[in-house]
């Protein structure tokens, strides 16, 4: 009987992981959208053009990386879980 429960629990975990991973491609769509709308300056070989293109690309990469940073969201979620469990620890006496 416990093996049936274990199999059911494993199937449930796999289903949740599959659903969670299916929700992730929005970042890839945003990435493609940003890269398709990039208006880099035509490269004429000058240092100024190369610098502008570099800085613009660096800004885009920074935005994409900031979207992937979930540590901040997890920290906030943990804080609010603590507040829901023990309001005194968050808001004082």
Curated annotation (Swiss-Prot):
Primary residence: secreted
Annotated signal sequence range: 1-23
Entry annotated with the keyword Signal: yes
Endoplasmic reticulum keyword on record: no
Localization per Swiss-Prot or TrEMBL: Secreted
Annotated Gene Ontology cellular component terms: extracellular region
Keywords from the UniProt entry: Cleavage on pair of basic residues, Disulfide bond, Secreted, Signal
Disulfide bond annotation, renumbered to this chain: 83-90
Prosequence residues removed at maturation: 24-61
Coiled-coil boundaries: none
Role according to the record: Inhibits juvenile hormone biosynthesis.
Protein name, as recorded: Allatostatin C
């Amino acid at each position: 009987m416990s093996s049936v429960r274990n199999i059911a629990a494993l199937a449930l975990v796999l289903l949740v992981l599959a659903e969670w991973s299916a929700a992730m491609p929005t970042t890839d769509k945003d990435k493609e959208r940003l890269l398709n709308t990039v208006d880099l300056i035509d490269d004429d070989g000058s240092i100024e053009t190369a610098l502008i293109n570099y800085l613009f690309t660096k800004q885009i990469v920074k935005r994409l990386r900031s979207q992937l940073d979930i540590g901040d969201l997890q920290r906030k979620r943990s804080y609010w879980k603590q507040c829901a469990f023990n309001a005194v620890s968050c808001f004082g006496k």
